[in-house]
């Protein structure tokens, strides 16, 4: 499943799989992978424009470097673990109270982060692919300051 960068803010996602797996869900349930809202032309046009932009500016080529920068900068005694892949990262703290306090402090300084519904001890960092290295530095500095 993919959706974050695909629509450039418009509601669209993609269900991508091998032929073997797609064949296995053909009838159990029948076409269980389709939606009732899929394929709207405006959203598809936005998706196409987003993909063109991502390719033109080679945004995927820079994701590993940006992930490494986040991981390098996000070091603090209150951070138990950093998980994730690319620009979809999780910062584990001791408890939800710490997560909520950190989120509120970050918001006061213009940085929007969230938590995971399935793991409330973790901050969710998922910036757009266009985030610059200087913005990553600002975000990390704000998070670290908010943890103090």
Question: Model-derived features: where do they sit?
Answer:
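Conserved N-terminal phosphate-binding loop of PLP-dependent enzymes in the Aspartate aminotransferase
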Residues: 1-148
